[in-house]
């Protein structure tokens, strides 16, 4: 109740070496369901008091999702649809979601193509993500809230950036681009919960949490360049206990 109604989809277009949800990203977790059942799940989450429907890594199931949302809306689904994505998506896919998605929650992971090639096997990630986010912002425009900025978002785009160990220069380039391109049209979430798991052992430079100094350096930069609509994190979040188990609950 009073939380995000997360619906995780199996599979991911990216193959990040530091993936926190590897069992679902590589398609080994999950359950096959019908479009009709997906629509029912959306309605069940609304009935339980969810504030929104949060579609996590949904890109490969967009046609089915569109049908499921339409079915659910015909049965009184009212809460916002959130599209939670790595941004490694075809622009035509995003365009097809106009009128379906209310809130976009994209990542902008890398500015430097060498980093995206090394850590996500996607040298074209920066250019693909730019185009995808541009289409998302075109659709939503500036954020709209229920009752002012302290209330729930009804429509808008929140771009997330996870700082990687030793990559503050790249993080600053991402933030500068987003601010210079979109200004206060978007919200930016600067995240520090990078959690080194066994999958980064071949990448010793990633085999640590980011330091408090690294995070503060990036946040200070965001303030200095004039970012006003932003979210920052406080406290310790880089723990394996924060990574969800996927047991098909609710499916």
What is the predicted role of each segment?
Residues 98-112, 185-194:
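Non-cysteine beta-strand/loop elements that form the S-adenosyl-L-methionine
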Residues 5, 53, 81-83, 104-106, ...:
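Hydrophobic faces of well-ordered beta-strands that scaffold small-molecule active sites
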Residues 68-80, 131-139, 212-220:
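Alpha-helix-loop-beta-strand connector modules within alpha/beta enzyme cores
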Residues 141-251:
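Auxiliary Fe-S-binding modules of radical SAM enzymes
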Residues 1-103, 112-114:
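Conserved Radical SAM active-site core
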Residues 116-150:
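Anionic-ligand binding region
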Residues 33, 60, 120-128, 166, ...:
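Alpha-helix N-cap and loop-to-helix initiation/capping positions
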Residues 25, 62, 87-90, 108-126, ...:
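Conserved radical SAM core fold
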């Amino acid at each position: 109740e009073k939380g995000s109604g997360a619906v995780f989809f199996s599979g991911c277009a990216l193959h990040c070496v530091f993936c926190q949800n590897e069992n679902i990203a590589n398609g080994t977790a999950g359950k096959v369901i019908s479009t009709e059942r997906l629509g029912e799940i959306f309605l069940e989450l609304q009935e339980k008091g969810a504030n929104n429907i949060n579609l996590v890594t949904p890109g490969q199931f967009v046609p089915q999702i569109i049908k499921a949302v339409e079915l659910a809306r015909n049965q009184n689904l009212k809460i916002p649809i959130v599209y939670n994505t790595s941004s490694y998506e075809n622009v035509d896919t995003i365009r097809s979601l106009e009128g379906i998605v209310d809130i976009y929650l994209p990542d902008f992971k890398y500015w430097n193509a060498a980093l995206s090639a090394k850590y996500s096997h996607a040298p074209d990630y920066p250019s693909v993500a730019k185009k995808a986010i541009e289409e998302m912002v075109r659709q939503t425009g500036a954020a709209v809230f229920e009752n002012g900025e302290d209330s729930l978002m009804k429509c808008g785009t929140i771009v997330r950036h996870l700082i990687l160990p030793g990559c503050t220069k790249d993080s600053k380039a991402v933030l500068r681009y987003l601010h210079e391109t979109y200004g206060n049209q978007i919200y930016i979430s600067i995240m520090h919960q990078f959690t080194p798991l066994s999958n980064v052992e071949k990448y010793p430079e990633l085999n640590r949490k980011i330091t408090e100094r690294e995070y503060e350096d990036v946040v200070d930069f965001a303030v200095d360049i004039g970012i006003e609509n932003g979210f920052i994190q406080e406290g310790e979040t880089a723990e394996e206990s924060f990574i969800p188990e996927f047991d098909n609950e609710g499916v």
